Structure formats: C-alpha cells, structure tokens
Curated annotation (Swiss-Prot):
Residues 17-80 form the S5 DRBM domain. One of its GO terms (biological process) is translation. This is Small ribosomal subunit protein uS5. It holds the Pfam family Ribosomal_S5_C. GO terms for cellular component: small ribosomal subunit. The gene is rpsE. Part of the 30S ribosomal subunit. Contacts proteins S4 and S8. InterPro entries: Ribosomal_Su5_D2-typ_SF (IPR020568), Ribosomal_uS5 (IPR000851), Ribosomal_uS5_bac-type (IPR005712), Ribosomal_uS5_C (IPR005324), Ribosomal_uS5_N (IPR013810), Ribosomal_uS5_N_CS (IPR018192), Ribsml_uS5_D2-typ_fold_subgr (IPR014721). GO terms for molecular function: rRNA binding; structural constituent of ribosome. It comes from Delftia acidovorans (strain DSM 14801 / SPH-1). It comes from the Bacteria. The N-terminal domain interacts with the head of the 30S subunit; the C-terminal domain interacts with the body and contacts protein S4. The interaction surface between S4 and S5 is involved in control of translational fidelity. Keywords: Ribonucleoprotein, Ribosomal protein, RNA-binding, rRNA-binding. Coiled coil: none annotated. Gene3D superfamilies: 3.30.160.20, 3.30.230.10.
Length: 173
C-alpha cells in the first residue's frame, strides 16, 4: 500500500513532445504532530528524434507532482545522435549502484530493455536496441544511469575529430 504501480503511462500535450510517466511514489514526512503525506513522480519527455529529458516532481497531490516532473523534464533535455533508430556503439552508464549497458541492434530487433529504460528509448526515438541493467533496480537510478550512458555515446565524426583522422580512416583501421 506504500507504493503506486510503476507502470509507464502516456500523457497528452500539443507541443510535439512524447511524455511518459515512469513512477509515482507515496512519500511521508514525519513531524511532531504526525505524518505529512506527499507524492514524488518521475517522468521522461522526448521528441522522438534524438532529444530526451528527465524530471522529478514532488507535491501533496499526484497531478501536481506529475506536472512539476514534466516541466523539469522539458528543461533538462539533452541531444543524442542516433543511427537508423539505434545508437552508434556500445556504451556503459552508471549512477549510484545502478549500471546499464546499451548495445546497438539491427533493424527489426525492437527495444529489448527493462522498465524505466524502455520508456527513455521510446520517447527518444530509438526503435532497435539491446539494454541490460546491473545492480540497483530503483527507477530513478536506472534512468539516471541510462542518461549517463547516452551522454557518453559519440558519433564516428566526433571520434575522427578527436584522433585527427577522417571518418573513412576510422572505419578501415
């Protein structure tokens, strides 16, 4: 009874961004006069074309917490380069005790990922990926670890620029 279902839910808006609610938790603050109940919501927002953001909102009521989380998600968006609906290379990410490994997948594979990671990939616009999480299964830590991994992904042109070579040299070497 202390937790709500961590099912992912769609929320509708008209600005062209996809919104997913990952988790809503009931939280309590114990004071001298008793307990104060509140809610914490975790959401992700993306444009389906490589931009994604996450946010956490807290309030006394669920709708207000979700609204705050959605607004924070819109403010915290990052850009991720995609290649034909997947990522360019294998990346690892970590936050707290949660670590995730994201592997690119061929077309038709689909999103093979658990829980909170799946919601991030759906709003990001990734259609084919294989992801594995290790350690903590806390939704907040898993989403933060996924964002850490996505921030570490690079394009072949970025790798070539760092090495002072052309993109063709990177693939032939």
């Amino acid at each position: 009874m202390a937790k709500f279902s961590p099912k992912v839910q769609d929320e509708g808006r008209d600005d062209g961004l996809r919104e997913k609610m990952i988790a809503v938790n009931r939280v309590t603050k114990v004071v001298k006069g008793g307990r104060i109940l509140g809610f914490a919501a975790l959401t992700v927002v993306g444009d389906g074309d490589g931009r994604v953001g996450m946010g956490k909102g807290k309030s006394k009521e669920v709708p207000a917490a979700v609204q705050k989380a959605m607004e924070e998600s819109r403010r915290n968006m990052i850009k991720v380069s995609l290649k034909h609906g997947t990522i360019h290379h294998t990346v690892m990410g970590q936050h707290g005790a949660a670590s995730v490994m994201l592997n690119p997948a061929p077309k038709g594979t689909g999103i093979i990922a658990g829980g909170p990671m799946r919601a991030v990939f759906e709003v990001l616009g990734i259609t084919d990926i294989v992801a594995k999480s290790h350690g903590s299964s806390n939704p907040y830590n898993m989403v933060r670890a996924t964002f850490d991994a996505l921030k570490h992904s690079t394009t072949p042109s970025e790798v070539a620029a760092k090495r002072g070579k052309s993109v063709e040299d990177i693939f032939t070497a």
